């Protein structure tokens, strides 16, 4: 949340908020998607997208400049071939966008941060890119009724003004990659080796 608030405040500078929490549960009805949407106060809900499409890089970049929170709902639906594009989008801090029927590009700051949900535990396909995702197992139904947006965002703003760190250190990134191993999808070769030699 600190990374999101820093991104919205324009504090991220040359480094964007490149980490996305992914809420994971094999059980339906845990309120994962509802929680993601509930993070946005009602006055900002129009800046929330819950169906990020990775079919057009230009469209995705426009969303980075115009939205506040992009939910990669059902994260496992994204093909492995789209992961390089997603990782690139997540690290972008400035965007060069050309609107339809215009000849010149405009440089716009990135505003949006990412979040995601999944019903599968084997959702990460690139072990080198797992530091971009903070996979969190949801073990029970999330109570979305008690979110006090004014308090949350006031606290985030205060922490940022006091200089709170909103990025991971190299050591924390290493711990994150280790944590995410339980959410890693095995390749076909790994599956065959595991089946033959366990």
Residue ranges of model-derived segments:
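Feature primarily recognizes SF3-like P-loop helicase cores of small DNA viruses
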Residues: 16-19, 46-47, 57-82, 88-90, ...
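Short amphipathic alpha-helical segments and helix-helix/interface helices
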Residues: 36, 86-87
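Hydrophobic alpha-helical membrane-insertion segments
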Residues: 41, 82-83
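P-loop NTPase catalytic core of nucleic-acid-dependent motor ATPases
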Residues: 1-65
């Amino acid at each position: 949340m600190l990374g999101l608030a820093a991104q919205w405040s324009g504090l991220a500078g040359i480094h964007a908020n490149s980490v996305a929490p992914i809420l994971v549960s094999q059980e339906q009805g845990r309120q994962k998607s509802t929680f993601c949407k509930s993070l946005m106060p009602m006055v900002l809900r129009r800046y929330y997208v819950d169906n990020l499409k990775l079919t057009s890089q230009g469209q995705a970049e426009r969303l980075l400049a115009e939205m506040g929170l992009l939910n990669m709902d059902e994260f496992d639906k994204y093909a492995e071939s789209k992961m390089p594009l997603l990782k690139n989008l997540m690290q972008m801090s400035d965007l060069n966008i050309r609107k339809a029927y215009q000849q010149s590009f405009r440089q716009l700051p990135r505003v949006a941060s990412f979040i995601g949900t999944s019903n599968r535990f084997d959702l990460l396909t690139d072990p080198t890119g797992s530091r971009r995702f903070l996979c969190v197992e949801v073990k029970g139904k999330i109570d979305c009724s008690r979110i006090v947006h004014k308090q949350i965002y006031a606290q985030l703003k205060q922490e940022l003004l006091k200089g709170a760190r909103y990025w991971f250190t190299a050591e924390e990134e290493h711990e994150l990659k280790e944590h995410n191993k339980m959410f890693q999808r095995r390749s076909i070769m790994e599956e065959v080796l595991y089946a033959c030699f366990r």
